[in-house]
Regions:
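Glycine-rich phosphate- or other oxyanion-binding loops that anchor nucleotides, phosphorylated ligands
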Residues: 1-152
Length: 152
């Protein structure tokens, strides 16, 4: 159960944005059909969870769904995303991770829960409100990322 302001480590994603690898493949960068069975690096996830625990920062772990935006989701879209296995929704991250994995770069990602798409908790939200929630969560997120980078 997520709450506004929670941090979430991405364990996987569902990409509903056009795939950035569509088109001619550049073989020097990676294979035509890159494996995505381990999209997010388990070692980095484990290290981040340890860092969060040491610093008393609660984190969630879940599946991120990437959409094109720029609209926020409808209640029916939120329902659909829960049905297909998503925990959170955003308008970025997955395309960048797909490109990085194509190049065999280990990936790690986190999100801030800025609003809730759960029945009974869906409410009108503005971009400014989303930014405010993100600003409050930013110091915790930054601490985890800085310590994770230092541990590599």
């Amino acid at each position: 159960s997520y709450e506004v302001g929670d941090l979430m480590i991405l364990s996987d994603h569902i990409n509903l944005i056009p795939n950035p690898l569509i088109g001619q493949n550049i073989a020097e960068l990676g294979p035509r059909f890159p494996d995505m069975s381990e999209t997010y690096c388990p070692t980095l996830i484990e290290k981040a969870e340890t860092i969060a625990k040491i610093n008393n920062i609660p984190v969630q772990k879940g599946v991120y769904i990437a959409l094109t935006g720029p609209t926020l989701e409808t209640p029916a879209e939120y329902k659909y995303m829960r049905i297909i296995g998503g925990d959170t929704v955003g308008m970025s991250t997955a395309p960048e991770v797909i490109v990085a994995r194509h190049m065999d770069i280990p990936c790690f990602a986190m999100s801030v829960i800025t609003d809730l798409g759960v029945p009974g908790k869906i409410k009108k939200v503005t971009h400014e409100e989303i930014q405010k929630v993100s600003e409050v969560a930013e110091p915790k997120l930054t601490l985890i990322i800085k310590e994770l980078i230092a541990s590599i």
